[in-house]
Amino acid sequence: FRILLFKIFNKIETWEYLESKIGNYITLSNFDLDVYSNILQEAMDLGYVIYTSAYMSCASKKFGYDKKHQNHLALIDRMVCQDRVINPIVKARNLEEIFHILASYPLLGKFMAYQLATDINYSEVINFDENSFTIAGPGAERGINKCFIHTQGKSYADVIYWMTENQENEFQRLGLNFQSLWGRPLKAIDCQNLFCETDKYCREAFPGLKSNRKKIKAKFTPTPQPIDYFYPPKWCINDQVQETLAQRLPPLEIPNLQDNGQQLSLELDSLVKTASEISDNVSKLHKKYTQETQNKKSKALKNTELQKSQQLCLF
């Protein structure tokens, strides 16, 4: 349920917004189609975009609702609550069978069904060979067409399999010092995604290449918050990731940062004044200066008269 719900919207901010409104850990036990629908509608009314531009599901009124998110939530309700799709999934004999189970539902489409099957396979629910099945999405098809002049009648999936199986030979042939994911080589899904990214890169770098897609709609926006990297535990690389990050990053001394921040805040507070305070201070200084000047002049005049008086006494 959680995998399906996240994948449909595929946006961390949407997930976090749901969690903040539900007030609990998102589980099937607290799923309510109407409640979730109202929460997401509220988010959209506030100006939030609840979908990402990647892995978008089909948009239609298949389940009779006017809004896209309502139909997608109805799809989740049908799959998880009514059909209990988890039962045939755990009984499936291979990854391709899971793909066909998911692809039989409306609003998903073949590519989304493949991505969803892969995500489920990353979990502890099932455990099939990741390279046992693949399909090429529209972006990967365009990327393959731009990489190969002629594929000798091979299908797009065959090209992805070939790239997956021959990656080490190609790295050596091209002199590429490819850095694997802590010893984990590229899988079929990775090569599929790479062909898709190649298509996007070529649109910008080589706009003259023949393609039915010319422009790049989405622009990368970095996330200021630090990323807590975590991979499927079955990959057995999370400990290595943490060790590598610990070697790269200096220890962060939070108490010192807090002390420094408080000291800086105090210093800024002592320096920053409002315009009215500055104006009052200037006025006070002006009055003080004027008074001191008058006092000095009066004192000087008295001294002069005293000196004259003393001089008269001498004569």
Question: Where in this protein do the model-derived segments appear?
Answer:
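Generic structural signal for hydrophobic core residues of well-folded globular domains
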Residues: 3-11, 79, 102-105, 120, ...
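Structure-specific DNA junction-binding interface
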Residues: 1-62, 242, 246-264, 312-313
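Helix-hairpin-helix/helix-loop-helix acidic hairpins
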Residues: 56-106
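Phosphate-backbone recognition surface of nucleic-acid-processing proteins
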Residues: 121-172
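Low-complexity, acidic/Ser/Thr- and charged residue-rich accessory regions of DNA metabolism proteins
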Residues: 171-292, 296-315
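Active-site-adjacent structural elements in folded domains
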Residues: 81-89, 97-103, 124-128, 167-179
